[in-house]
């Protein structure tokens, strides 16, 4: 609204509601901050210069000599809305080593209210810092590394192209001229999107989901330095609306799943010649589906998250039946991340400013009325540290129970729920329980 426009009664009401909403959000945040020492073993809150729409842990971890810290790396990006050059960023995160011998009381005493951090065992440099910036044309909608070579990072752009950067061929600090020089350009889609997935079993194969209703499939091993632009091996055209997400199956190199604003879940087989019709599909939700995630330890189970505020659990053997609906979010479910070490736990991010951790083992468990007021039995933990929509989450492959979450108000958080809250729930899950 321009400053010189008269405020109508309706506008004034909207402004008043917005102020009330902000006050409520701030009050909730104060309560969360007060309870942080009792809910977490680690919390790091880092204010970015620009919001990041994406975050993903890199798989490496190194000890920092003569300290109680390990060093891990995160891939993030910028969303400057044209106000500055955009960048793909590699950030270093210093995390306390496990088993450092800190008592619970000492841990609570080490809570730094000003920094909003817990787990600062020793004096240290900045806990999160950029160690490499690479120029990017427009905001980084999503960034994901190739499993077989984590130095190769693909990004979703606002133009529809997918960029691939070999970060070892770029300086640690991006040139000030802002010129974007991806090592490979994947062409063929005409609109932006967010879904991006590397094949963990077939090196170089990557999928991209687009607002132009297509799914692109490329093999980057087909590129040459003389011509770094690649056309897709295939464009899949089965969806009738914006394709929000796509993911390769972790145990079948020929299978992938896609979800769309059309409410459809589609399972594709790359050995089929029909790129217009999926091998199987189902109406998954009665609203837009925003994300899909296959269970890394299962051949059959996967999750979908929707703008109907729910997460659905599916079994590929019985796709016509939704096996369970996880219900606790109060706004769109935007992203999902399975634990890399536990087959029964996953995290979900939502526009309701929350990240939830869920426990498949607890589905159907008995609850007291008091417990039921806090949510269903399978809701293990609620992270309330964000005051704006959570855009992306990533579960650390190197530090069990450590999660990174990025929100649209420039905040990046790295956190680990208290071991006392999670220990009773670290159990085994049997897929036969679903049958």
Curated annotation (Swiss-Prot):
The keyword Nucleotidyltransferase does not apply. Signal peptide: none annotated. It is found in: Cytoplasm; Nucleus. It holds the Pfam family CAF1C_H4-bd. InterPro entries: G-protein_beta_WD-40_rep, Histone-bd_RBBP4-like_N, WD40/YVTN_repeat-like_dom_sf, WD40_repeat_dom_sf, WD40_rpt, WD_repeat_RBAP46/RBAP48/MSI1. Residues 370-374 are annotated as: Interaction with the histone H4 N-terminus. WD repeats lie at residues 135-175, 188-228, 238-278, 284-324, 328-368, 385-425. GO terms for cellular component: cytoplasm; nucleus; Rpd3L complex; Rpd3L-Expanded complex. Keywords: Chromatin regulator, Cytoplasm, Nucleus, Repeat, WD repeat. This is Histone acetyltransferase type B subunit 2.
């Amino acid at each position: 609204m321009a400053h010189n426009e008269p405020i109508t009664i309706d506008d004034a009401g909207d402004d008043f509601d917005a102020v009330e909403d902000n006050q409520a959000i701030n009050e909730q945040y104060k309560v969360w901050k007060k309870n942080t020492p009792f809910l977490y073993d680690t919390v790091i809150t880092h204010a970015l210069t620009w919001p990041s729409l994406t975050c993903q842990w890199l798989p490496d971890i190194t000890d920092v000599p003569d300290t109680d810290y390990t060093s891990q790396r995160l891939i993030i990006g910028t969303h400057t809305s044209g106000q500055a050059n955009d960048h793909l960023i590699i950030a270093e995160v210093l995390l306390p080593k496990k088993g450092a011998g800190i008592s619970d009381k000492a841990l609570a005493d080490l809570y730094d209210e000003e920094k909003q951090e817990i787990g600062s065992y020793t004096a240290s440099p900045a806990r999160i810092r950029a160690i490499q910036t690479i120029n990017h044309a427009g905001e980084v909608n999503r960034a994901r590394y190739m499993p077989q070579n984590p130095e190769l990072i693909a990004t979703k752009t606002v133009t529809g192209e997918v960029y691939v950067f070999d970060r070892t061929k770029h300086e640690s600090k991006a040139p000030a001229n802002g010129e974007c020089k991806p090592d490979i350009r994947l062409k063929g889609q005409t609109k932006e999107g967010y879904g991006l997935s590397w094949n963990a079993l077939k090196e170089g194969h990557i999928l991209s989901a687009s607002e132009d209703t297509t799914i692109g499939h490329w093999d980057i091993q087909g590129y040459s330095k003389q011509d770094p632009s690649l056309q897709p091996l295939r464009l899949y055209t089965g969806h009738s609306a914006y394709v929000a997400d796509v993911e390769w199956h972790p145990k079948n190199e020929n299978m992938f799943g896609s979800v769309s604003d059309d409410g459809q879940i589609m399972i594709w087989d790359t050995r089929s010649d029909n790129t217009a019709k999926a091998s199987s599909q189902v109406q998954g939700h009665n609203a837009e589906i925003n994300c899909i995630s296959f269970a890394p330890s299962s051949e059959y189970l996967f999750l979908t998250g929707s703008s109907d505020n729910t997460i659905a659990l599916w079994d590929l053997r019985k796709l016509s039946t939704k096996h369970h609906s996880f219900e606790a979010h109060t706004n769109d479910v935007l992203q999902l991340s399975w634990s890399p070490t536990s087959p029964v736990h996953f995290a979900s991010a939502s526009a309701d400013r929350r990240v939830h951790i869920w426990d498949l083992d607890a589905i159907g468990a008995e609850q007291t009325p008091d417990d039921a007021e806090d949510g269903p039995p399978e809701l293990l933990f609620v992270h309330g540290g964000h005051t704006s929509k959570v855009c992306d989450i990533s579960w650390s492959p190197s530090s069990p129970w450590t999660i990174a979450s990025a929100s649209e108000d420039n905040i990046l958080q790295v956190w680990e729920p208290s071991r006392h809250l999670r220990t009773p729930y670290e159990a085994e899950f049997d897929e036969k329980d679903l049958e």
